Swiss-Prot record:
GO terms for molecular function: ATP binding; carbamoyl-phosphate synthase (ammonia) activity; carbamoyl-phosphate synthase (glutamine-hydrolyzing) activity; metal ion binding. It comes from Rhodopirellula baltica (strain DSM 10527 / NCIMB 13988 / SH1). Keywords: Amino-acid biosynthesis, Arginine biosynthesis, ATP-binding, Ligase, Magnesium, Manganese, Metal-binding, Nucleotide-binding, Pyrimidine biosynthesis, Repeat. Residues 1-402 are annotated as: Carboxyphosphate synthetic domain. Residues 133-328, 683-878 form the ATP-grasp domain. Pfam families: CPSase_L_D2 (PF02786), CPSase_L_D3 (PF02787), MGS (PF02142). Belongs to the CarB family. This is Carbamoyl phosphate synthase large chain. Mg(2+) 3 binds at Q833, E849. ATP 1 binds at R129, R169, G175, G176, E208, I210, E215, G241, V242, H243, Q285, E299. It comes from the Bacteria. Mn(2+) 4 binds at E849, N851. Its cofactor is Mg(2+); Mn(2+).
């Protein structure tokens, strides 16, 4: 085979932290690529900053560097490892941009590193808007009329040619960052300036608007012999104007005529050849004007993308794996198809089912943000479903979103027929403006008597889709007319199930319970069957067990053999509070079961993840995580147990229902999980063990809440029970705040009680992850938080080993952990959050909460210590003892590891960025060094907070941080920085002999801090808030800082750590080291 033997060592650059526009799909593609290249005998060096990935496991690559993704840091890795080649196309936009920077700064030439799959010229031709336009003109393909500009003056000239509305698109960004639609000249100027700021090359394209056109994507692969195949054609349900990452998408394309498809296919082949992507996958986006059929090319990603992951999962064709092998010289016809084992990769996949992807949003976390969907991506996750028909697939996707919908209406989310039923005017407004709820308003429009033609005129959604949704309403109306469950006959029930109606919807329509509908359905002999995802529409036998459910006659799942079977329930779509960290745990659970000779069965609905790769588990079910879908799988597979500990809140919410249906839950019991969540039971348990908790109470209504607040006192922490990610959690400092926040907490709690705790001000928060086998408990990691208590643990930076806790406090933490594990009879993972508060001269330990499940810190602990925490916990749950696994001592590394959170504020203009008890981060990074200060500096750099070496720093600390302001000010002056401050802080600093330039508050006129930001004349903002919210002066300053790309630190502890890091960076260079070498030094 003609694979390249002149290359021995290959560098892969990962995509960094999970952010909006770039999520787990790049962990999936990078992991596949590492496996594929090592399979071929190449040595793989990986650089990535995200510890929560399978890609950064020490077993995935030969040398793994968890380091910031800047060209300067990657150069140090290259100098140390001396790779022969760099594969830049599998790390998303981040990896591509770092590769381009390495090339532009002469690093690749200096060390003789060859870029494979796509070189810098090819990447620039695809990514730079003007070059791409010229390339399309050359091959006779139409593009939007547009002009590439680098200044606002040139943008205004372009607008005169293009006209309004106009689309602003920055070059070299992902997830549509900085892209927007301008409807008037005033907006245009600010949108262009923002676009220029966000483009790493300060370049934007001003182009004609094609809002309302139909949008399509083609996934294309090419090898070095110029063989090109189309993997998948994807159609956007939402028309142009909504970023494809925020659109509902369907595969295969449903509304293209054969002639249109062939024209688009021919164009795709021409594009990939003209741009010159030598090998691998590319994603090409098209728009079609529905009335004239005019087709234009929108853009091309010369790399594996979010859509590539979707196309891989939709077809079963492993795009990233094949792309990696093509990059080292293989041809498509030489590579076997893993699924059929008979066909080759040059066979274009054919599918006999319909796939629907739906985006998941988090606007509830950012109430001040504009929730309109535009050309800039805002969704934080997605779910994918597979069905035999569009209707079945569409309804399964809606229930896979986990937003309270169990299909297209007739469920707890449905407003129709309630007191909140929208009016005709509200419906028309929601249809004409794209938003996350628009799909539900299409239902209300039909229920209100609007026609498909009227809905099309308001939404531009293709009539074919609307006709199918109208048929779902007709089926629902038919069921309502029948009325009683017992009156529904077999044919009607089967027809409803084939159209994707859930038992929950039928229960709502017939006023019965879900379990009654399930019993009736089973009595009728109506069960789902499971079909294979096989790449070939059943033409060849499939050898990889990858299944979806549908209501037909013949099932394809294998009968149970001699092996034990265990089901792992995944986490569903990413959301803030439940993301890649839990998928990491699910993957390790599967690997551990396989090592023990137990058949692992993965159930998940997230197309971005490694857990839904067909070779992560023995059997994969791509299904929504609802009680109905999971019980159906358990009926078909007869597992010996189900793991609910690893997928976050989603599987925990199903645990009780599964247990009641007779499904065995392995590991910690459901009763223990409930005890830890039940405030009253847990409080009495804490008292029984002689441990401390902050004073707390529980309220089921507003009157009880007032009584509890009076007893507990302020500041008080208010939160609903049974939620993840601190949803609707707030700190209240007085009664008026309390009344406002408690009302919201009751809405979110949805019938569950609201919890009220005394908030411990100025306490240090500590996270502990441990494994217990029911007898012994071993601590895996003690993490000290850098931000004080009150910032959600998911948003706070934390450090292993702890940096300020005394040995007596650590001993007390260890003792409390063991007591709790024993009393709760934990089998598997456990996470405890402690707070240490100085009371007089003595530190006092409080227990904040206990979670007898995987926490989001498990991957970080595993990377910091080198211990495969989730793998060991799974083996304990499957019956091994810690002694049998030789796990007896807490691992304490010699190096310092700091986890830092990454926040999405740049996508939500105008939102105040102050951190609080509700989690808002989308991802995380890790900084590693022998020194705390350098590890912290690395974590900041990796998270995008570039600590400056010179320039101006705005310092504004609240009144209770006076002394800290003085010491920070002195340190910054000694480092050579110039200080800016408003009146109050300036007076304090000057009184202590610290030179400062005064700036006016926004309300006082000019020059104020926003003027400095606009002039690029401030490099860092250190601001601890005295007030919160985007409407305050401070809030506006913080939000403006984010939009201008200026780092903004809002807690005193982080500000002090940042100044320590800036001092250390003067004297100590950032060194890089692989995890494998670090772990060897710990032994």
């Amino acid at each position: 085979m003609p694979r390249r033997d002149d290359i021995k060592k290959i560098l892969l650059i990962g995509s960094g932290p999970i952010v909006i526009g770039q999520a787990c799909e790049f962990d999936y593609s990078g992991t596949q690529a590492c496996k594929a290249l090592r399979e071929e005998g190449y040595e793989v060096v990986l650089v990535n900053s995200n510890p929560a990935t399978i890609m950064t496991d020490p077993a995935t690559a030969d040398a793994t560097y968890i380091e910031p993704l800047t060209w300067q840091i990657v150069e140090k890795v290259i100098a140390k490892e001396r790779p022969d080649a760099l594969l830049p196309t599998l790390g998303g936009q981040t990896g591509l941009n770092v590769a381009m920077d390495l090339d532009a700064n002469g690093v690749l030439e200096k060390y003789g590193v060859e870029m494979i799959a796509a070189n810098a010229k090819v990447i620039a031709k695809a990514e730079e808007r003007e070059q791409f336009k010229q390339a399309m003109d050359k091959i006779g393909l139409d593009v939007c009329k547009g002009f590439t500009v680098r200044t606002l003056a040139d943008a205004r000239k372009a607008l005169a040619e293009v006209g309004l509305p106009a689309v602003v698109r920055p070059s070299f960004t992902m997830g549509g960052s900085g892209s927007a639609i301008a409807y008037n000249k005033d907006d245009f100027d600010s949108l262009v300036q923002n676009g220029l700021d966000q483009s790493p090359v300060t370049e934007v394209l001003i182009e004609e608007s094609i809002i309302g056109w139909k949008e399509y994507e083609m996934e294309v692969m090419r090898d070095c012999d110029d063989n090109v195949v189309i993997i998948c054609a994807i159609e956007n349900f939402d028309p142009m104007g909504v970023h494809t990452g925020d659109s509902i998408t369907v595969a295969p394309a449903q509304t293209l005529s054969d002639k249109e498809y062939q024209r688009m296919r021919d164009a795709s082949l021409a594009v990939i050849r003209e741009i010159g992507v030598e090998t691998g996958g590319s994603n090409i986006q098209f728009a079609i004007e529905p009335d004239t059929g005019r087709m234009i090319v929108i853009e091309m990603n010369p790399r594996v993308s979010r859509s590539s992951a979707l196309a891989s999962k939709a077809t079963g064709f492993p795009i990233a794996k094949i792309a990696a092998k093509l990059a080292v010289g293989y041809r498509l016809w030489e590579l076997p198809n893993d699924i059929t084992q008979k066909t080759k990769a040059c066979f274009e996949p054919t599918i006999d089912y319909v796939v629907t992807k739906m985006p998941r949003f988090a606007f509830e976390k950012f109430p001040e943000a504009d929730a309109t969907l535009t050309t800039q991506m805002k969704s934080v996750g997605e779910t994918m479903s597979i069905g035999r028909t569009f209707q079945e697939s569409f309804q399964k996707a809606l229930r896979g979103l986990e937003v309270g919908a169990f299909g297209f209406g007739s469920d707890p989310k449905d407003l129709w027929g309630t007191e909140d039923q929208p009016s005709r005017d509200e419906i028309r407004a929601k249809l004409s403006t794209p938003g996350s709820e628009r799909v539900f308003y299409i239902r209300y429009a039909f229920k209100d008597g609007m026609t498909a033609a009227e809905i099309h005129s308001l939404t531009n959604i293709d009539p074919w889709f609307l006709d199918h949704l109208q048929q779902l309403i007709e089926t629902e109306d038919n069921l309502r007319a029948i009325g009683k469950l017992d009156a529904i006959d077999v044919d009607t029930m089967r027809d409803a199930k084939r159209r994707g109606f859930s038992d929950r919807q039928i229960a709502t329509i017939t006023s019965k319970t879900e379990s009654q509908v399930r019993a009736k359905r089973l009595e009728m002999g109506i069960r789902p069957v499971y079909k294979s995802v096989d790449t070939c529409a059943a033409e060849f036998e499939a050898f990889t067990p990858y299944y979806y459910s549908t209501y037909e006659s013949e099932t394809e799942v294998p009968a149970k053999g001699d092996k034990k079977r265990v089901v792992i329930l995944g986490g569903g779509p990413n959301r803030i509070g439940q993301g890649i960290e839990f998928d990491y745990c699910c993957c390790h659970a599967s690997f551990a079961l396989q090592e023990m000779g137990i058949e692992s069965i993965m159930v998940n609905s997230n197309p971005e993840t490694v857990s839904t790769d067909y070779d992560t588990s023995d059997i994969l079910f791509f299904e929504p995580l609802t009680i109905e879908d999971v019980l159906n799988i358990c009926d078909a597979m007869q597992p010996d147990g189900v793991i609910v500990q690893f997928g976050g809140q989603t599987p925990l919410n199903l645990a009780r229902g599964l247990e009641q249906a007779g499904v065995p839950i392995i590991g910690t019991s459901v009763d223990t999980i409930d005890t830890a969540e039940d405030r009253e039971l847990f409080s009495s348990l804490i008292d029984e063990l002689g441990l401390r908790q902050p004073p707390s109470g529980i309220a089921r209504n507003m009157d009880e809440a007032r009584v509890e607040a009076k007893r507990i006192g302020y500041p008080a922490l208010v939160r609903p029970s049974f939620v993840l990610g601190g949803r609707a959690m707030e700190i209240c400092y007085d009664h008026s705040q309390f009344a406002r926040y408690v009302a919201e907490a009751f809405i979110v709690a949805d019938g569950q009680p609201v919890l009220i705790d005394r908030f411990l001000e100025d306490a240090t928060e500590v996270d502990v992850d441990a494994i217990s086998d029911g007898n012994d408990c071993v601590i895996m990691g003690i993490m000290e938080h850098i931000e004080e208590a009150g910032v959600h643990s998911g948003d706070s930076a934390c450090c292993i080993p702890p940096f300020s806790l005394t040995q007596p406090v650590l001993a007390e933490i260890r003792d409390a952990t063991r007591k709790l594990a024993a009393r709760l009879n934990v089998v598997g993972l456990m996470n405890i959050q402690f707070a240490v508060k100085m009371e007089g001269t003595q530190p006092t330990l409080y227990i904040l909460e206990v979670n007898p499940r995987a926490s989001r810190t498990v991957p970080f602990v595993a990377k910091a210590t080198g211990v495969p925490v989730a793998n060991l916990a799974t083996k304990v749950m499957a019956g091994k003892t810690l002694k049998e696994l030789n796990v007896t001592e807490e691992p304490i590394p010699r190096h310092v590891s700091i986890k830092e959170s990454v926040l999405p504020f740049r996508k939500f203009a105008g939102v105040d960025i102050v951190l609080g008890p509700e989690m808002r981060s989308t991802g995380e990074v890790m900084g590693v060094s022998e020194l705390f200060s350098i590890a912290f500096a690395k974590s900041q750099l990796a998270a995008g907070t570039v600590l400056p070496e010179s320039g101006k720093i705005f310092l504004s600390l609240s009144a209770n941080h006076k002394e800290a302001a003085e010491s920070l000010g002195k340190s910054l002056i000694e480092l050579g920085f110039e200080l800016l401050a408003t009146e109050g802080t300036a007076v304090r600093l000057e009184a202590n002999g610290i030179a400062v330039t005064r700036v006016k508050k926004l309300s006082e006129g000019h020059p104020n801090l926003i003027d400095y930001l606009k002039n690029d004349d401030v490099q860092l903002i250190l601001n601890t808030p005295s007030g919160k919210g985007a409407r305050t002066d401070e809030g506006k300053i913080r939000a403006a800082g984010v939009q201008h790309g200026v780092p903004c630190i809002t807690t005193l502890a982080a500000a002090e750590a940042a100044v320590r890091a800036m001092v250390a960076m003067r004297d100590t260079p950032m060194e890089v080291e692989s995890l494998q070498r670090r772990y060897a030094q710990n032994v």
